[in-house]
Amino acid sequence: TRFALVSWARRCVSETAIKLEHEISMLDENEKKDYLDLMNMDEPVLNKIIFEGYKMLGLKTFFTAGPNEIRAWTIKNGFTAPNAAGVIHSDFERGFIKAEVIDFDDYIKNGGELGSKENGKLRLEGKEYLVKDGDVIHFKFNV
């Protein structure tokens, strides 16, 4: 039947797209860029799906960074700095003092926290600060 044919075609297209996305994910950055350019794409479809999903669900990502690890945390739109701190640990929210915040692009451009601080890109935010997508945050707290 026509429905069965359409259903089969959708499955095949989906399976092919999934395989292509997997292959793209296995490429090094230069090969990935060349492949995406060849396909006239600016980024993998999976990135777009994740981004749109976050928008639809009202979610944002902020980062914490230490000497050996950078970690992404998911929060809801409208979270204040103490709310975001609470995602890491309830003590962080309860004892929140302030947040040291760097915009993600500034963090990358300045080579991390130290360079951002030296170039005046680190700012102190209080309890009312609404966390922005991509903020790199170091929470100060006391419990």
List each language-model region with its residue ranges.
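C-terminal-of-GTPase-core extension/linker across diverse P-loop GTPases
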Residues: 14-132, 137, 142
